[in-house]
Amino acid sequence: KNPNDVIGEFLFLISNLYSSQDNFEKSNFYLNLSNFLNPKFLFNLSLVAENQYSNKQYKKAKKTLEKFKVEDDFYYWYRIKKEAQIISKQRNKKESLNYITAEFAKINEPNNKVIFDIANFYKNSKEYEEAIKYYTKIIDNLDDISEMKADLLYRRGGSYERIGIYDKADEDLLYALKINPDDAYILNYLAYSWL
């Protein structure tokens, strides 16, 4: 591997650290160095777009996102999600949801990550029935004791609770707690729902 590539990837990690602390000036400094040394490293562009989005530079973020092409499934889905988030900020959640669901419908065989993301978009848009449908698709294909299943049961249970189906909400939350008995979020949600 080219030494510049390795150094560029290391600088990306530093940039990401600063970005996670909302220090975008330093993040962008290290990101520019990383980009200079390793322009092929696509993670750089995703962090550029993320920093621009966090700074409400939506026009710049959209331009950066255009570099992610449909041929690269992972980055293209990242682009779609980020564009939907921008639509939500600039217009409204309904248009954002319409955009992402239209793009989702074009995917022949979405993987669990994509299905998870679309479920979360529905949940965040208060479209709980649709969120439940997609969470269920993933839950049905997971091992009974996976921590991921516990998280999905928590999310689906919360969606059931929001639409007043309390018995199914409790069932999901108790099952999630059985898988992951120390999860404070699940314990808190159950305690709150029983009040």
Model-derived regions: residue spans:
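Single-residue signature of alpha-solenoid repeat helices
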Residues: 27, 61, 96-97, 131, ...
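TPR-repeat structural position
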Residues: 24, 58, 93-94, 128, ...
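TPR alpha-solenoid repeat register
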Residues: 44, 78-79, 114, 148, ...
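Short coil turns that delineate tetratricopeptide repeat
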Residues: 39, 73-74, 108-109, 143, ...
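Structural motif corresponding to the intra-repeat A-B loop/turn of tetratricopeptide repeats
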Residues: 21, 55, 90-91, 125, ...
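Hydrophobic/aromatic packing residues within the alpha-helices of TPR/SEL1-like helical repeat arrays
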Residues: 31, 65, 100-101, 128, ...
